UniProtKB/Swiss-Prot annotation:
PANTHER family linked: RIBOSE-5-PHOSPHATE ISOMERASE 3, CHLOROPLASTIC-RELATED (PTHR43748:SF3)
Record-linked InterPro entries: NagB/RpiA_transferase-like, Ribose-5P_isomerase, Ribose5P_isomerase_typA_subgr, Ribose5P_isomerase_type_A
GO biological process: pentose-phosphate shunt, non-oxidative branch
Enzyme superclass (EC): isomerase
E.C. code: 5.3.1.6
Residues given in the record as substrate binding sites: T29, G30, S31, T32, D85, G86, A87, D88, K99, G100, A101, G102, K126
Domain of life, source organism: Bacteria
Organism: Synechococcus sp. (strain JA-3-3Ab)
Catalysed reaction, written as an equation: aldehydo-D-ribose 5-phosphate = D-ribulose 5-phosphate
Protein name in UniProt: Ribose-5-phosphate isomerase A
Amino acid sequence: MASADELKQAAAQAAAQKVQSGMVVGLGTGSTAAFAVGALAQRMQKEGLQFIGVPTSERTAEQARSLGIPLATLEEQPRLDLAIDGADEIEVGSLNLIKGAGGALLREKLVEASAAELIIIADASKKVAHLGTRFPVPVEVVRFGWKTTLARVEALGCQAVLRRTAEGDPYLTDEQHYILDCQFGPIANPAKLAEQLKGTVGVVEHGLFIGMATEAIIAGPEGIETLRQS
């Protein structure tokens, strides 16, 4: 039976085939997205694929540079042909997502909102009937007054905790913000919750990606499954 990493690798390889020479491609962040960056670098070396990557985090930028992928900022390339990224949960049917376990939700959303297509890659464990079933919703907040912001977010119906590093320090995003991991349970109306979170004072961004994914490539024990919005 294939391991989770082998399934992620299979989905990443399938997504990398979508990229054509001349494209500007958003490069996601996280363990699954890292496989896609590696698969694209392989195509550059073996097939002569030429593209420009727009990374969604310093971590992804470092990986891409080490593999020889030419990079640009969102300011330099404000329109992307497609973006490839992972997800923590994928709601079957809507393709609404929870993202942000890798801590890059703000830059991911900025880059991926600028892409004509967003291809999500994942193993089959990430499919859910309702967002919030397994994963918390990451909420990026300013550091000033974060406990007050946490209380405001919890008033929306969740239990929120400050994300910390393995050493016990508050986790800092690339933009030097904190992240609250918010357990809502199954979310009946993700679009409404997204609006409520966005309107909460102190919240910079949240990990609900509503209506953004155009396609999800899911790798499972029986092969590759492609999901589209229904």
